């Protein structure tokens, strides 16, 4: 039996035409990496037009057509004009329509003017030989990483042992309970790590809206057309060529999206090769919620929740923690609904993906908060409180202690890997778009998103952390660990639910029941 929250969501969506076009994106479970077609997607698609590449020409792999076009343009010193607005689409079918935009794209993706011979003889300039060798080596390294980590993840280790005998939780984080009586709490100030592209679906909602099911959407929003452009332009990773940025990257949380689009290629390359910034990563970052706003909303909800209860009906510490996790899950669902790719799925597929990975997204959200902002020896709650880890450990039972210990180990690993916000966002999408979810109507889209995000993450890591040669693989290997912790947390939560310790009207439990159905 599906929980009420799902039936309401599906019923309303069907009443507006089945298609689940609403803001949204999320994560996924056991991460089985397939042998993605990196040869085709990364090595054999011309970055200018998408045609099959024929070899290295003027600085990078391109097709014969773009090679010849670039050579003729440079040798004949041609000057083109664009009759549109200098943003024509260049692909295999219409690459000849606008030579101006085609040539600009050649420069943007990295074809080098200085590689064209002025004497019109055959063959390029020998000084690019070492660069080609390095490029080949990088591509071979990419393939090796993909295959190695694919094998490692296919042979996933057994999930951590769940639910030991001692399931007591003595007084679980007493200081949170006392602090909640007098909220405001000591807020943790979030610095420039947070961007300001507010999700339209979650921005400015009063706390009362958090009581509503996140799946119940107004007829107005359901009737709205899909996001402009939909999935067009995202089908192949080749469409997301790395942008050229002068010097350091602008931080996406303090810069407009436009500021990330880069500078004219030739000018930027004057001082050497700039790093690359996969455009897909920028698009994923735009979906991120504003964390201070989420924090304020959850705090307001908890205040309202406690204030509405009588003196002897106040939630105990564990009840408060459940409410906190419950509201965090609401915000995660809102994030998913407002995210690229996810909103293109029908409602049934959205529900299957969310039911599969909701606990992993909660764990990943918690872990990343610790990596970025928690003080040593403390746990940072979504409400902004720093809680002493030793105090929690001393008051928790064996199972909760085991969970916390595994989570802290994961935090330490990710800190040592220097996990950043861009990588975190990629991991969220890899979890949400799980290849393990069965009976999806649009499995092709899920598979495509996995491939694109994997490729974008790999490019980002290799360009920005070249000294950490195994970072990409190490990041992917954390996904099974997140999965294992989340399954253990689900078992623990279910046990507490059976004992009547979890507050009623809880989205956590509804999702738990839906997953077990």
Swiss-Prot record:
- The residues that the entry says bind Zn(2+) 1 are 46, 49, 63, 66
Q: Where is the composition biased (Basic residues)?
A: 186-199
Q: What happens when the gene is disrupted?
A: Larvae lethality from 9 to 14 days post fertilization (dpf). Fishes show an open mouth and an enlarged Meckel's cartilage of the lower jaw, but no other craniofacial skeletal defects at 6 and 10 dpf. Impaired development of the exocrine pancreas and liver, while leaving the endocrine pancreas intact. In the developing liver, defects in hepatic progenitor outgrowth and differentiation are observed.
Q: Could you tell me the keywords of this UniProt record?
A: Chromosome, DNA-binding, Metal-binding, Nucleus, Receptor, Transcription, Transcription regulation, Zinc, Zinc-finger
| GO CC annotation terms, alphabetical | chromosome; RNA polymerase II transcription regulator complex
Stretches the record annotates as C-terminal extension (CTE): 112-127
Family, according to the entry, reads as follows:
Belongs to the nuclear hormone receptor family. NR5 subfamily.
Put simply, this protein is called Nuclear receptor subfamily 5 group A member 2
The organism's lineage? Eukaryota, Metazoa, Chordata, Craniata, Vertebrata
């Amino acid at each position: 039996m599906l929980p009420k929250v799902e039936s309401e969501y599906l019923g309303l969506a069907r009443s507006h035409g089945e298609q689940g076009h609403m803001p949204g994106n999320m994560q996924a479970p056991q991460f089985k990496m397939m042998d993605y077609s990196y040869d085709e997607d990364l090595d054999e698609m011309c970055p200018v037009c998408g045609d099959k590449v024929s070899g290295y020409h003027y600085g990078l792999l391109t097709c014969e057509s773009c090679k010849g076009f670039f050579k003729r343009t440079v040798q004949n010193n041609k000057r083109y004009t664009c009759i549109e607005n200098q943003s024509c689409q260049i692909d295999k079918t219409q690459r000849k329509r606008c030579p101006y935009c085609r040539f600009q794209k050649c420069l943007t993706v990295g074809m080098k003017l200085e590689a064209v011979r002025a004497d019109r003889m055959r063959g390029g300039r020998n000084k690019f030989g070492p660069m080609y060798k390095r490029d080949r080596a990088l591509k071979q390294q990419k393939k090796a990483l993909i295959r190695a980590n694919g094998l490692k993840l296919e042979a996933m280790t057994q999930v951590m042992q769940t639910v030991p005998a001692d399931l007591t939780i003595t007084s679980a984080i007493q200081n949170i309970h006392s602090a909640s009586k007098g909220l405001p709490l000591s807020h943790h100030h979030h610095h420039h790590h947070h961007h300001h592209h507010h999700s339209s679906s979650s921005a400015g909602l009063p706390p009362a809206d958090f009581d509503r099911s996140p799946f119940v959407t107004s007829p107005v929003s359901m009737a709205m057309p899909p996001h402009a452009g939909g999935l067009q332009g995202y089908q192949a990773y080749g469409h997301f060529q790395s942008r050229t940025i002068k010097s350091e990257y602008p931080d996406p949380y303090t810069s407009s999206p436009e500021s990330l689009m880069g500078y004219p290629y030739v000018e930027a390359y004057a001082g050497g090769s700039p790093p690359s910034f996969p455009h897909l990563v920028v698009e994923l970052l735009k979906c991120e919620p504003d964390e201070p706003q989420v924090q304020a909303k959850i705090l307001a909800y908890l205040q309202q929740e406690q204030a509405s209860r009588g003196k002897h009906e106040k939630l105990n510490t564990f009840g408060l923690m459940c409410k906190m996790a419950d509201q965090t899950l609401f915000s995660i669902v809102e994030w998913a609904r407002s995210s690229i790719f996810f909103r293109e799925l029908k409602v049934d597929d959205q529900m299957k993906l969310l039911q599969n990975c909701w606990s992993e997204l909660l764990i990943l959200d918690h872990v990343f908060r610790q990596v970025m902002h928690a003080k040593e020896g403390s746990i940072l709650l979504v409400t902004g409180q720093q809680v002493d880890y030793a105090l929690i450990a001393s008051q928790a039972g064996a199972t909760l202690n085991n969970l916390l210990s595994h989570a802290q180990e994961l935090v330490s690993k990710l800190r040592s890997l220097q996990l950043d916000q861009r990588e975190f966002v990629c991991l969220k999408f890899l979890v949400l778009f799980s290849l393990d979810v069965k009976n999806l109507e649009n499995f092709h889209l899920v598979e495509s998103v996995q491939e694109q995000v994997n490729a974008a993450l790999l490019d980002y890591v290799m360009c920005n952390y070249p000294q950490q040669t195994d970072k990409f693989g190490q990041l992917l290997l954390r996904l099974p660990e997140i999965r294992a912790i989340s399954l253990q947390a689900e078992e623990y939560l279910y046990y507490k639910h059976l004992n009547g310790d979890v507050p009623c009207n809880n989205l956590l439990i509804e999702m738990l029941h839906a997953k077990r159905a």
